[in-house]
């Protein structure tokens, strides 16, 4: 908890100064795993703050009786409500997509968020940034840069039929798939997320 007790209008709640003057990029805040592996950094240079790497998510509840889904599962909104403690916050209810080009898609399942809202376990649904998505061979091979929309295979995306970002667009592929080179018809690939 940070609190600014300085009464002036130009007081800071938190001020971080690092590095030397002169415009060179400075790493202000670093995020690390217990083993020292770097997860990301907030840095600045010449008046621009940079967040890298990042992935934005929305917390969401799953259908009753479901504990989790596979990482990369494509999830659609099935309902919304408000948190009784934070009435401006939206609580999403989600389930895996089951039809092609579902415009109710919220993002891609990541993991259990480790907290509850209104007595429902919350799970992280990736919506912007980068990560992975489960895809199938619907609409054919996937090239780097192809948009991904939902498919008829439960919880899987497929190559979108065109290259225009639409309400059905979930992601953009950053990994190519030639299905004739694969042993199956589904795969987890890297992507950037575009559902926001």
Tell me what each language-model feature is:
Residues 1-196:
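Extracellular receptor-binding modules and their adjoining Ser/Thr/Gly/Asp/Asn-rich linkers
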């Amino acid at each position: 908890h940070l609190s600014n007790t300085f009464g002036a209008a130009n007081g800071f709640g938190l001020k971080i100064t690092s590095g030397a003057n002169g415009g060179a990029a400075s790493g202000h805040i670093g995020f690390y795993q217990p083993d020292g592996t770097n997860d990301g950094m907030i840095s600045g240079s010449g008046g621009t703050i940079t967040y890298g790497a990042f992935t934005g998510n929305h917390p969401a509840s799953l259908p009753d009786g479901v504990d989790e889904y596979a990482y990369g599962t494509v999830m659609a909104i099935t309902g919304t409500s408000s948190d009784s403690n934070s009435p401006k916050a939206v609580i999403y209810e989600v389930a895996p997509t089951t039809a092609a080009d579902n415009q109710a898609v919220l993002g891609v399942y990541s993991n259990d968020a480790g907290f509850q809202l209104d007595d429902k376990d919350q799970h992280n649904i990736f919506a912007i940034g980068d990560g992975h998505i489960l895809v199938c061979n619907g609409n054919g091979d996937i090239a780097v840069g192809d948009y991904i929309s939902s498919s008829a295979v439960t919880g899987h995306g497929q190559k979108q039929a065109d290259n225009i970002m639409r309400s059905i667009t979930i992601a953009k592929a950053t990994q190519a798939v030639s299905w004739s080179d694969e042993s199956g018809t589904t795969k987890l690939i890297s992507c950037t997320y575009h559902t926001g």
